[in-house]
Amino acid sequence: MMTLDPDLQSIQEVRNCLAQAKEAQKALEKMSQSQIDAIVRSMAAAAEKEAERLGRMASEETGFGIPADKKRKNLFVARQVYGAIKDMKTVGIIRRDEQAKVWEVAQPV
């Protein structure tokens, strides 16, 4: 059985991830504000639920930081950052300036 060079395997994994990301982006582009809001809400809930485990994993993987501090950082993002962005409009016309004849249109990417 032929083994793949680790660098080549990593490059292929990145290519696969990029292809999946492009497909996900195409799906996100078609979603409504309520669908995007539901995704972001679910992401924040998952981040909060898994804050301790993810903090521990980050510390173990990098060899840096204290798992409890990583957990606090994850909880901050899951709670405060989510709270700050949850009501942002991110789909469709988000601002109109009739005087300048400018409309700002958002599209999820």
What kind of feature is each model-predicted range?
Residues 1-109:
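N-terminal Rossmann-like NAD(P)+-binding subdomain of aldehyde/semialdehyde dehydrogenases
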